[in-house]
């Protein structure tokens, strides 16, 4: 970080986006496990994730498409997970929403996560966040909120 510290933004509403990723580099294609891989971390200065900055976002509950199911890759930061969410995201944006709120992939009634973040609710004085059951990325948002609430 010291070498590239000039790239770390310090203006209000900015941050350093960190994206690690891993991809297979085997010499042949096929239906087999990966034997060699490349691990890369991209660091990029960014502004607000949403066009409206730090203002609340308008979200829509997705009742048709499924982002992830238990036993799949939903709990991993996996590039393929984004493909499953594109259609619903495009519909949401076309209708004036910033994000999709995803429901479970089986019954379509239990809240799982937002398209770009975990979700944490305060309902009747109780803090509620979806359980990590294999289809939700265990992200820094919910972990940070839960730690803050525990410390209070």
Regions found by a protein language model. Give the residues of each.
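N-terminal leader/propeptide and maturation segments of large enzyme subunits in energy/redox metabolism
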Residues: 1-3, 9-11
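Active-site loop/lid in soluble adenylation, ligation, and acyl-transfer enzymes
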Residues: 5-6, 21-25
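Short boundary motifs at domain starts and secondary-structure transition points
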Residues: 7-8, 31
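C-terminal catalytic domains of large/alpha subunits in multi-subunit enzymes
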Residues: 15-17
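Helix-start/capping segments and mature chain N-termini
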Residues: 21, 28-152
């Amino acid at each position: 970080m010291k070498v590239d510290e000039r790239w770390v933004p310090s203006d209000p509403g900015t941050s350093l986006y960190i994206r690690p990723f891993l991809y297979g580099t085997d010499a042949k294609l096929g239906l087999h496990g990966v034997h060699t891989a490349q691990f890369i971390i991209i660091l990029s200065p960014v502004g607000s994730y949403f066009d409206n900055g730090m203002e609340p976002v308008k979200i829509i509950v997705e009742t048709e498409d499924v982002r992830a199911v238990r036993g799949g890759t939903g709990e991993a930061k996996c590039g393929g997970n984004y493909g499953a969410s594109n259609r619903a995201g495009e519909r949401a944006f076309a209708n004036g929403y910033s994000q999709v709120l995803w429901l479970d992939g089986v019954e379509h009634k239990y809240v799982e996560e937002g398209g770009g973040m975990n979700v944490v609710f305060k309902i009747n004085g109780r803090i509620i966040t979806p359980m990590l059951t294999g289809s939700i990325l265990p992200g820094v948002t919910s972990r940070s909120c839960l730690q803050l609430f525990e410390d209070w």
